């Protein structure tokens, strides 16, 4: 069975969860309308086998600063903990 895994990340688990492999991370805030709409798009991946990390930008300002996040939602792609790409804004499922 194929599933999507949405993992809430924070200061305590970020490094452990993202240090190995290819990881897609969304930085969001609860007050951002685009972020709420983005969550609906992410939940549309239930028919694929994909791991997506979620970071609340208000709760983890040090991670926002570390990765140079200037707006929400922002996606970063990590390979073995190193940022290899960054995408800012709302994306439909087909664009991700």
Stretches with model-predicted labels:
Residues 15, 60-63, 94:
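Short loop/turn elements that flank and shape the SAM/SAH-binding pocket of Class I
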Residues 1-16:
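N-terminal "domain-start" segment that seeds a small globular fold
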Residues 7-9, 27, 46-63, 69:
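Thiol-based oxidoreductase modules, predominantly thioredoxin-like and allied folds used
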Residues 71, 76-96:
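Non-catalytic, surface beta->alpha helical segment in thiol-disulfide oxidoreductase systems
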Residues 22-23, 49, 73:
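Alpha/beta-hydrolase fold active-site loops
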Residues 34-48:
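Typically the conserved alpha-helix immediately C-terminal to a functionally engaged Cys/Sec
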Residues 18-30:
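Short active-site neighborhood of thiol/selenol oxidoreductases, capturing the structured segment around
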Residues 32-35, 75:
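The canonical Cys-X-X-Cys-His
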